[in-house]
């Protein structure tokens, strides 16, 4: 098991959640949620957190249909991952994110009821779930 810092993204066409984690502990925490327009974020905001955290690896959630097939947003998430690599030179891993948003909503509701279910919290928590799920698959 290595001690890499890993950043996770929950890609969406209107909002993108971010989380940061350590491979050695297999845990992550939410960082932020960024507004996007048709899947395109404000790259200066993304650059800021990448410079601040300097991740060794970035995991991008891959939105698939429940049967494992791809959908339009799957292609957009792959483009986002490719742009992250191209702009910042970071190593990228794609990870199946099916049901991460459902799990994030359940987790947040359990902790704080309906008030905790704002979109930013859900997206950042989804990024945590994607990242921790990726850690589990590695070991």
Swiss-Prot record:
Enzyme class (EC, first level): hydrolase
SMART domains in alphabetical order: YqgFc
Keyword field: Cytoplasm, Hydrolase, Nuclease, Ribosome biogenesis
Gene Ontology biological-process entries: rRNA 5'-end processing
Domain of life: Bacteria
Signal peptide span: none
InterPro entries the UniProt entry points to: RNaseH-like_sf, YqgF, YqgF/RNaseH-like_dom, YqgF/RNaseH-like_dom_sf
One Gene Ontology cellular component: cytosol
Molecular-function annotations in GO: nuclease activity
EC number: 3.1.-.-
Compartments where found: Cytoplasm
Function recorded in the entry: Could be a nuclease involved in processing of the 5'-end of pre-16S rRNA.
Similarity remark: Belongs to the YqgF nuclease family.
PANTHER family xref list: POLYNUCLEOTIDYL TRANSFERASE, RIBONUCLEASE H-LIKE SUPERFAMILY PROTEIN (PTHR33317:SF4)
Protein name: Putative pre-16S rRNA nuclease
Organism: Proteus mirabilis (strain HI4320)
């Amino acid at each position: 098991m290595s001690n890499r810092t890993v950043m996770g993204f929950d890609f969406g066409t209107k909002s993108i959640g971010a989380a940061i984690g350590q491979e050695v502990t297999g845990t992550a925490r939410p960082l932020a949620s960024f507004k996007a327009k048709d899947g395109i974020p404000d790259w200066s905001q993304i650059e800021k957190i990448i410079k601040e955290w300097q991740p060794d690896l970035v995991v991008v959630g891959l939105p698939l249909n429940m049967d494992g097939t791809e959908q339009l947003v799957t292609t957009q998430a792959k483009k986002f991952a490719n742009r992250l690599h191209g702009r910042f030179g970071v190593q990228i891993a794609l990870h199946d994110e099916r049901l991460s948003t459902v799990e994030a909503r359940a987790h947040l509701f359990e902790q704080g009821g309906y008030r905790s279910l704002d979109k930013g919290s859900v997206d950042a928590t989804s990024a945590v779930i994607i990242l921790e799920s990726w850690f589990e698959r590695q070991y």
